[in-house]
Structures are given as structure tokens and as C-alpha cells.
Amino acid sequence: MTAPEKPVKQEEMAALDVDGGGGGGGHGEYLQQQQQQQQQHGNGAAAAAAQDTQPSPLALLAATCSKIGPPSPGDDDEEAAVAAAAGVPAAAAGATGDLASAQLGGAPNRWEVLSATPTTIKDEAGNLVQIPGAATSSGQYVLPLQNLQNQQIFSVAPGSDSSNGTVSNVQYQVIPQIQSTDAQQVQIGFTGSSDNGGINQENSQIQIIPGSNQTLLASGTPPANIQNLIPQTGQVQVQGVAIGGSSFPGQTQVVANVPLGLPGNITFVPINSVDLDSLGLSGSSQTMTAGINADGHLINTGQAMDSSDNSERTGERVSPDVNETNADTDLFVPTSSSSQLPVTIDSTGILQQNTNSLTTTSGQVHSSDLQGNYIQSPVSEETQAQNIQVSTAQPVVQHLQLQDSQQPTSQAQIVQGITPQTIHGVQASGQNISQQALQNLQLQLNPGTFLIQAQTVTPSGQITWQTFQVQGVQNLQNLQIQNTAAQQITLTPVQTLTLGQVAAGGALTSTPVSLSTGQLPNLQTVTVNSIDSTGIQLHPGENADSPADIRIKEEEPDPEEWQLSGDSTLNTNDLTHLRVQVVDEEGDQQHQEGKRLRRVACTCPNCKEGGGRGTNLGKKKQHICHIPGCGKVYGKTSHLRAHLRWHSGERPFICNWMFCGKRFTRSDELQRHRRTHTGEKKFVCPECSKRFMRSDHLAKHIKTHQNKKVIHSSSTVLASVEAGRDDALITAGGTTLILANIQQGSVSGIGTVNTSATSNQDILTNTEIPLQLVTVSGNETME
């Protein structure tokens, strides 16, 4: 049996509110009392199960919110009016008995019971839009988070007339990615509106309020970009949102270093944009401190802390000390570590910096212990001079560069402690020097080597250099430089090499060449005072217009003929296939007028000892190799020279094919090697038309044809010698070449030939016939 429910009157609700002790607490007690009444009128099993279970989360939320503070007396009446306007009477709300469907919403000083009935409105196109939420009296919509998944929810701006179904032009789509494990709600409200019922895009705000009372503020969304709720020009402040037991911390602050431009062409660049490896700063951190002295010059230094515990490196400091009159300045410049970068600004306002240079305008350097020492530059306007003293115990090479102070420096860094107009003399002992046109420079050195290069700029804009070398000299006094302008002195290691230049006519000019150990301590110092043309090979450029252009072109020999030059030789295999071409010498001399080549006698020791004739075996000159144990004989000087290159290992012929570079002693070897790259096969077999790269391979192949060839002939007269008239007889004196061993019908070693297929001329042409030398006297007659 279920007992009828007992309605709760308005007076009882007011009494509960007053007796609760707090306005907010009255709501919580009223909800608890209503729940107890519902449990009492239920059946026994349902009541027992309800007592064992915990209260709903919505009831706990109402009990927690009731402890915030008491509402004002006027708020109670306002609550009733809002509840009545919402169409949800208190009695009806209590009579429903379903607390899970009830929703509470309110301002900081009031609470509202919102209806769970969805709101249906019409848009401009006439379509019905259903909002699954509850509307408050202030025009706000309360939407449960569990209904936001995979749904498009549109909120209407305040000021629009929702009664007649009109919707403003701006629609806001709620982000569907918001998820929650409990019944948390998202409240979307609008803080400003325009006169025409739309949203003021400049002042409107969308406020998303989770259950943890932490806010996410975002500016209004332009109509053209509905998907993006955060415009680029707005500011977003994220304090932290707790959803489902997870926390999202605040936005991390990102600090970006950008180049900052200052007056005077000065730019501060972030340290992460500088390649530390190229500056020699890898593995160490550097802190740079910049300051400006009394003369307006930037003074920069760094204290480098190396990551490795190296006891030899120490940090130096720059301690500018400016007195009251701003006349004297002491500068301490680090010189021990290359990672400490002195940075200054010259007269043109250009920031200067160098890593591998010992740079100072005035100071004292001790190379015996460079770690942790300082360069001190006392400046006085009364003396108007700078003192420089260089003391070293080891041979060092320094580069003294003197250049005009008005020109910007690009090779070295200048640490300026005073204005350039106050520098008029440089000395080592420290006495005052009167102002004069010439500058006297004195360097006190222990035995070592110094290279001094003075650079001056003429009024026409040309830069001239003067080179001075100091080797093992204790004192070099009164070095005069003809330049009256103020100079800046820089000591840097020498790392340059000056080569001689070839003039247009092919003459070599003498230019001092200095190879120093500025940054190569393992090499010795080499000084060349002058250069002559003896033993120097000139390699002019590729410009064809230059009169000194020299080109050497290697002419490839004719593949069908042997060209025996001064760098050619033949081996025994090549001599078997040697073909000598006989040409008319008189006709050759007519074509080669003015191109006579002088023959050079053989310079081998055997030919020199024999008076330039070599060993004469009969009428033929022989050249014998003078290497002990060899004794090879050659008939030409070029063959002997090629043979001697084989003994010495010289291989002047180089293959110019890509990625090859093989070297050969003879030119024919190089030519044969080139065929392996090109694939050329120029030797053709006359029988089967096969092609070969080398002639010896072809000769071996032809022998296979000769061994397999069998010639059958029935009756053939191969050759016949008939006696003719007397004028056909050969009468000569000397050696005559005749045919021998010719028999009728056959040739010795070949066999018979069928003359029906080939003629006698073809047989004699294509057949190897043995030759015999016969000597005939002048009075003999031979048939």
C-alpha cells in the first residue's frame, strides 16, 4: 500500500527557511525533509533500499551550496517570483518526487529551480531548434554536460525575442569535446548586447563555469569564424579546470628572444641564435655583461665557466672605474680563454666581436701565465699617450695592424678606453711622448718572431700594406710609420699566406711570403724574403683572353697507326703487330715548312760514354738500359725513356675518367685503358666479324680460325713463274726480296687451293707467304 503524498504548503516552506538558521541552509533542509517524506510513504522494500544507499550528488551539491551565506530577505520573494515565472510551483516541484531531474541555478545571492523542459524556438529559416536545457530569468541557459556529446547546441543572445520564434544572426556552437564523469553543468552567458538585439562583438564575453568555480574567459566570436571560439586578437586566461578528477594547469608562459634594434646600428641578438660551435664556445656557458664608459663606448666581457673541471682556465672580469672627472679609465680585458668575447663599438657605431684574437689598444701582456691575467689600460688626457708592452718567453708570431680609426674594423676587435683623438704616440717604457706627426713604436721581445703589417689608407681610397719582420731581436726602436692620423693598434695571430702574382707578360713579381705559427704551434716559422722564377711552375687561370694563358692539349693518337713519340715505348707483344707506313719524305717536307723539330740526343749514360752514338751493331744505333741487371736494348730513344720510367716508377699518363685516376707509364697503355670505360671494340675479325678491344686478343682469335680451316682443291696451280723476255730479268746490285719455296699447285704449309672460287690474286693477298732475302751481285742475272 502506498500512502497518499502530503502536500507541503507555502507557510511550511517559509517556516523551514526561517528555522534553518541560514537562507541557503533552509533550501537544503527542505530538500532533505522532502526526501524523508518520500521515503516514509514508499513501500517497505524500497524504503529499506533507499536508506542503505547514499544521497544523490545533486542533494550533496545543494547541501554544500547552502553553506555559502544567507540570502537577503528580498531574495526569498524574488525566488518565489522566479519560480512562478518559470512555471514550476513549489508544491508541484515537491510533489514530483524525482530530485535527479531538478536543476538549481542562481546568482551569488539567489537560487533558482530550473525546469528541465527543453526550449523550442524557430530560426530565420523557419526550422525548429530545440535547446535541451533550462532558461534562467537573466537570459542564461544551463546545459548539462552529458547532453553535449555529439550534439549541436545553439544559444540565443539576450535581447532577442524568443516568444515569437526569432533568433539573432549570431549562433554559438558549444564545443562537443567537453566531457564529464559526474553531473557537472556548463553555464553560457552573455554580458553585453547591442540595440538591435544582436551580440556586441567587442564587449561580449562567453563564460563557461564548471563545478569547481574556476572560470575560462574567452572573447566574443566573429560571425565569419564560428568554429573558433577564441579569436587571435583576444586574451585567454586559463586558471585551471577540474573535470572528472583531472586537472589542467594554467597556461605556461612562453618567453621569446627577438633581436632588439638600438640607435647607432646596434642589435642585440638572442644567444640561442648564435652558432656556439663556430665561435669555439661548445660545452661552456657564458654570461656577458655590457657597460658604457664615460666616452660613450660599449665595454663587454664574459665570464666563461667551462663544463669540464679544468684548473688552467680561470674567469676574468672587466672592472671599469671612472673617476669624478671622467678622464682616467682602467679597463681589464680577458685574454686567457678564447670563449671570452670582447665586444666594442667603433666610431661608426658597428658592434665588433672576435673570438681568436688578442685585442687591446693599450695594456700589458705576459705570456708566461696568460690564465687569469689582465690587460690594464691607464688613460690620461694630460699625457695623451698609450703604453704598450709585450713580454713573451716563447717564440710567438703576432700581427700588428695599424689602420685608420675612421674606417670600420672587420678583422679584429678594438677595446676602446679613450677617444681616438688622444692617441698620438706608442712606446714600451712608459715615458711621456710629445705630440708629433710620427709615431714611435718600441717592442721589447725575448727571442721570437714577430710579423708587423701596417695598413694605411691614402686620400684616394687605396689601401697599402707595409710588412716588417722581427726575428730574434731584443729591441726594435723608432719604427716610424708615415701616417699622422690617429691609429688603433691590434695584436692578432697571423693566419694568412701571401703568394706571388704573375704579371700580364708572364713575369713573376717578388712578394714576401710568410708562413707563421699563429695558430699552428706544431709547425716552424718559415720566412721567404724573395722569390725568383727558378723552380716555380706557373699555372695560369682559365681565362682565354689572358696573354699568359697556357694550355696543353693531349692529342689522341690514330688508332690505326703507331705514333712513336718521346714518351712512348713498345713491348715485345706489340712488336709482333707493328705496321710501318712508308711515306714520301719530300712531300712531307713540303707540308712541314717552318716546323722542323730538332732531334735531341739520348741522355742515357751508355750513350754519353759512347760519344752520343750508343752501341753500334752494324749501321743500326742501339740504346741499352744502364740499370744493373737489366741490359735491354732499344732502337729508339723514346722507347728507352719509357723503359726508364718503368724502372723509376714514374707514371705521367693519368686517366681523366670520372672517379678513376689510374696512372700509366706509356700513352698506349692509357689509350688501351680508356677503351674499358668507353666500351670501344675497334679490332674486327675478318672471318666472323667479332670485335675486340685489344689487337693481341684479335690475333689469338684469328689463329683459332686458321687451325679449323681446311681448304680442299681438286687441281689448282697456285703460282707459276714463267720466263719472259730479257727485260723481265732482275739485274740489280744489293739485297732483293723475292718469293721462295713456291711449287706448282701448292704452297708449303698451306695445301691446295680451289681456284674456281677465288682468284690467284686473292689467294696471294690473304695468304701468309714466306719471304727469303737473296743477295745478288751487280753482274749476276737472275730469272
UniProtKB/Swiss-Prot annotation:
Domain of life: Eukaryota
Composition-biased stretches (Gly residues): 19-28
UniProt-listed Pfam families: zf-C2H2 (PF00096)
Modified residues (N6-acetyllysine): K553
Maturation and modification: Acetylated by histone acetyltransferase p300, deacetylated by HDACs. Acetylation/deacetylation states regulate transcriptional activity. Acetylation appears to activate transcription. Alternate sumoylation and acetylation at Lys-553 also control transcriptional activity. Sumoylated on all isoforms. Sumoylated on 2 sites in longer isoforms with Lys-553 being the major site. Sumoylation at this site promotes nuclear localization to the nuclear periphery, nuclear dots and PML nuclear bodies. Sumoylation on Lys-553 represses the transactivation activity, except for the largest isoform which has little effect on transactivation. Alternate sumoylation and acetylation at Lys-553 also control transcriptional activity.
Cross-linked sites for Glycyl lysine isopeptide (Lys-Gly) (interchain with G-Cter in SUMO2): K553, K595
GO molecular function, one term: cis-regulatory region sequence-specific DNA binding
Span of the annotated motif 9aaTAD: 463-471
Keyword tRNA-binding attached: no
Region (Transactivation domain (Gln-rich)): 140-239, 352-501
Residue spans of biased composition, Low complexity class: 29-51
Gene Ontology biological process terms from the UniProt entry: B cell differentiation; definitive hemopoiesis; embryonic camera-type eye morphogenesis; embryonic placenta development; embryonic process involved in female pregnancy; embryonic skeletal system development; enucleate erythrocyte differentiation; erythrocyte differentiation
Subcellular location: Nucleus; Nucleus, PML body
Ranges where the record places region Disordered: 1-55, 302-340
InterPro entries the UniProt entry points to: Znf_C2H2_sf (IPR036236), Znf_C2H2_type (IPR013087)
Cross-link named Glycyl lysine isopeptide (Lys-Gly) (interchain with G-Cter in SUMO), sites: K122, K553
Any single GO CC term annotated in Swiss-Prot or TrEMBL for this entry: transcription repressor complex
Acetylation recorded as keyword: yes
Keywords: Acetylation, Activator, DNA-binding, Isopeptide bond, Metal-binding, Nucleus, Phosphoprotein, Repeat, Transcription, Transcription regulation, Ubl conjugation, Zinc, Zinc-finger
Glycyl lysine isopeptide (Lys-Gly) (interchain with G-Cter in SUMO1), cross-linked positions: K553
Zinc finger (C2H2-type) boundaries: 623-647, 653-677, 683-705
Feature: compositional bias, Basic and acidic residues: 1-12, 310-319
Family: Belongs to the Sp1 C2H2-type zinc-finger protein family.
Domain-related comment: The 9aaTAD motif is a transactivation domain present in a large number of yeast and animal transcription factors.
Function in brief: Transcriptional factor that can act as an activator or repressor depending on isoform and/or post-translational modifications. Binds to GT and GC boxes promoter elements. Competes with SP1 for the GC-box promoters. Weak activator of transcription but can activate a number of genes involved in different processes such as cell-cycle regulation, hormone-induction and house-keeping.
Protein's name according to its UniProt entry: Transcription factor Sp3
